[in-house]
């Protein structure tokens, strides 16, 4: 019996040592320690031995059973560690490789400028108004004292739909609509996209504009100049030099264009138009021009962005080149 036990133990040791997977190891356990296993069969035969030998043989069988179980446990741990190491080696990261970076989005420079302009005018007591981009001729032209024979109303300058529908050429129609709803006095700005048939280094068919309007009983051109100077100083965070040049707009009288001085190039760049609201515009809204007066101004947000970020070509803002937009 003892020889059988020793032979069985050596056979189990070899089988466990040769096992290369948990599945094979489980088969070995069943083969030796299962209900019908080799060691279990030997344990059953102990009862047939002489009574004085049974305790010693039973003890020997249990010791071999315990040793085989320890061999199985040790081999199982070894196989799990080996499997884990192989998995880690497959998933190993080469830290010498160049990393993969996610491209983070950013706020478009025009949107940045638009938000900044809105905040500054809100601080100056202006309300923010919006209106439709598809307008009719009355709000875009007639209510603003632009007659039918005015050059701005030709198809060479304006995008027309059928009938009297068109893409608005400025945000002034928003001011007319708000005065119809609110009456006067009023103090507001209107921001948004506007459309004109123009394309060069400083013009695009679609651009962004903010127009301001103040109607009160004692509004003067001096108020207008002071407001624009204060706004532009705040926007550029420094004192800027402005030049007011006499100009003509159908909806303001007197009118002026405003240039801002660029020290870097020693040149002046036009940034906005302004003037006192024309009496005819007030009359169109049943407002007495002898009692009320006001001023209006229109600023190209794209021009402001060009100046703030020192961009020389306006079209760069609309070409969706991430190399350019990623700089802001």
UniProtKB/Swiss-Prot annotation:
Q: Which UniProt keywords apply?
A: Aminoacyl-tRNA synthetase, ATP-binding, Cytoplasm, Ligase, Magnesium, Metal-binding, Nucleotide-binding, Protein biosynthesis
Its recorded reaction(s) are: tRNA(Phe) + L-phenylalanine + ATP = L-phenylalanyl-tRNA(Phe) + AMP + diphosphate + H(+)
Report the subcellular localization: Cytoplasm
Cofactor section: Mg(2+)
Say if the entry is tagged with keyword Nucleotide-binding: yes
Cofactor binding note: Binds 2 magnesium ions per tetramer.
Query: For this protein, what is the EC number?
Result: 6.1.1.20
One of the protein's GO biological processes: phenylalanyl-tRNA aminoacylation
Keyword Disulfide bond among record annotations: no
Q: Which GO terms describe its cellular component?
A: cytoplasm
Main location class: cytoplasm
Report the GO molecular function annotations: ATP binding; magnesium ion binding; phenylalanine-tRNA ligase activity; tRNA binding
PROSITE patterns for this protein: AA_TRNA_LIGASE_II
Q: Per its UniProt entry, which superkingdom is the organism in?
A: Bacteria
Q: Which residues bind Mg(2+)?
A: 253
**NCBIfam families linked:** pheS (TIGR00468)
How it assembles, according to the record, is:
Tetramer of two alpha and two beta subunits.
- Show the PANTHER family listed in the entry: PHENYLALANINE--TRNA LIGASE, MITOCHONDRIAL (PTHR11538:SF41), PHENYLALANYL-TRNA SYNTHETASE (PTHR11538)
Q: What family classification does the UniProt entry report for this protein?
A: Belongs to the class-II aminoacyl-tRNA synthetase family. Phe-tRNA synthetase alpha subunit type 1 subfamily.
Q: What is this protein called?
A: Phenylalanine--tRNA ligase alpha subunit
Identify the taxonomic lineage of the organism of origin.
Answer: Bacteria, Pseudomonadati, Pseudomonadota, Gammaproteobacteria, Legionellales
The gene name on file is: pheS
């Amino acid at each position: 019996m003892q020889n059988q036990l020793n032979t069985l133990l050596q056979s189990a040791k070899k089988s466990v040592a040769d096992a290369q997977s948990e599945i094979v190891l489980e088969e070995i356990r069943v083969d030796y320690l299962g209900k019908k296993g080799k060691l279990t069969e030997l344990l059953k035969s102990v009862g047939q031995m002489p009574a004085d030998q049974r305790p010693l043989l039973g003890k020997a069988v249990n010791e071999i059973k315990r040793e085989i179980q320890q061999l199985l446990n040790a081999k199982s741990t070894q196989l799990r560690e080996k499997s884990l190491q192989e998995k880690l080696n497959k998933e190993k990261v080469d830290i010498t490789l160049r990393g993969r970076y996610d491209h983070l989005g950013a706020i478009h420079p025009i949107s940045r400028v638009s938000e900044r302009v809105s905040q500054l005018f809100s601080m100056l007591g202006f309300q923010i108004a919006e209106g439709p981009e598809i307008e009719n001729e009355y709000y875009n032209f007639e209510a603003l004292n632009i007659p039918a024979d005015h050059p701005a109303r030709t198809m060479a300058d304006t995008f027309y739909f059928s009938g009297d529908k068109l893409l608005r050429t400025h945000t002034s129609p928003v001011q007319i609509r708000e005065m119809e709803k609110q009456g006067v006095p009023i103090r507001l700005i209107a921001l948004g996209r506007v459309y004109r048939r123009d394309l060069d280094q400083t013009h695009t068919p679609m651009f962004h504009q903010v127009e301001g309007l103040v109607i009160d009983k004692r509004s003067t051109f001096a108020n207008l100049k002071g407001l624009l100077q204060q706004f532009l100083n705040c926007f550029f965070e420094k004192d800027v030099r402005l030049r007011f040049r006499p100009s003509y707009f159908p909806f303001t009288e007197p009118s002026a264009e405003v240039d801002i001085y660029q020290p870097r190039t020693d040149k002046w760049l036009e940034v906005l138009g302004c003037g006192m609201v024309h009496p005819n515009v007030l009359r169109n809204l049943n407002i007495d021009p002898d009692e009320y007066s006001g001023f209006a101004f229109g600023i190209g947000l794209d021009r402001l962005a060009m100046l703030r970020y020192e961009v020389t070509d306006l079209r760069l803002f609309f070409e969706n080149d991430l190399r350019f937009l990623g700089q802001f």
